[in-house]
Amino acid sequence: MELKERLQALKSEAVDKVSQITDKKALQDIKVSYIGKKGVITGLMKEMKSLPNEEKPMFGQLVNDAKQTVESAIAEVEARIEAELVNKRLQSETIDITLPGKKLSPGSSHPLDRIVEDIEDLFIGLGYEIVEGFEVESDHYNFEALNLPKSHPARDMQDSFYISEEVLMRTHTSPVQARTLESRNGEGPVKIICPGKVYRRDSDDATHSHQFTQIEGLVVDENIKMSDLKGTLEYFAKKMFGEDREIRLRPSFFPFTEPSVEVDISCFKCKGKGCNVCKGTGWIEILGAGMVHPNVLEMAGFDSNKYSGFAFGMGPDRIAMLKYGIEDIRHFYTNDLRFIRQFLRLEDGGEPNVSK
């Protein structure tokens, strides 16, 4: 059989086989065996040496045409196979749009997160900066830099979770204040709030938890006075608990402030007449505060003759309990969705239907 006849026969044979293929692997095998580098049609090029010189160019063209014909047939079948695969996949993934959909349950902010965000927004509006710090803290920043020497009762091992002799879980967010002051190289102003989790060796009950949330504030600048602290706390109380709230400052003691005060607000339930919320006093304690102790400023590199400041600390847990009428702090940390979902109404500006 002449080369031209063999070429024609191989081309017809390849096209016929390709037309019967139904999967990609078999199609690839046909392609390799006929028009691959070692394919039978490609191999005819090597036999051109037996042809007269004047016929070689024409035969070479015929071989290329045959390869293109087979490639076109392969491409056509490949497209058909791909389309069939797509159709099968679509059929298997068919969605019955008449079936009822799955209800998406709306989520809500955790009540503690919401209170923290509200407090942050309030103080951001006053020009405060939010600063966060380490939950695992050094003894120096947790105590000594805050005017609590080694001999102070608050340093008792029974009151704190110590990891080593010089490392513990922070007992308040005040170390953030100490670190921030130190980082300012003795230059004011400083105006920050420090939210975060804190840890103490308390027995868990309705009003105590070994882990709780705290937010502390610090302002340091020239000529900061007690009246600045009082004005700030009055603003906070009115924005958080209602414009008709009044505050009362009672003398207290904190190692890192002097003078120190406990801050009460007039009861929002009985309007000062006395009830179960305020325990008959007409007042509710919400936070502690005071003027920054000169020792704290000096240890951080500030000139206490030039700079003064005030600090305050509050527990969002307690504020949330007061604001929403929650009687057990443990509800915040049990991850009970029945409790959390009661706060969905807050997302729409309503009040929660809280089960105490």
Swiss-Prot record:
EC id: 6.1.1.20
GO molecular function, one term: tRNA binding
The keyword Ribonucleoprotein is annotated on this UniProt entry: no
EC supergroup of this enzyme: ligase
GO biological process: phenylalanyl-tRNA aminoacylation
Listed PROSITE patterns: AA_TRNA_LIGASE_II
Lineage: superkingdom: Bacteria
Subcellular locations according to the entry: Cytoplasm
Keyword hit for Metal-binding: yes
Catalyses which reaction(s): tRNA(Phe) + L-phenylalanine + ATP = L-phenylalanyl-tRNA(Phe) + AMP + diphosphate + H(+)
Signal peptide: none
Family label: Belongs to the class-II aminoacyl-tRNA synthetase family. Phe-tRNA synthetase alpha subunit type 1 subfamily.
Self-association state and partner proteins as the record states: Tetramer of two alpha and two beta subunits.
Protein name: Phenylalanine--tRNA ligase alpha subunit
Organism, scientific name: Macrococcus caseolyticus (strain JCSC5402) (Macrococcoides caseolyticum)
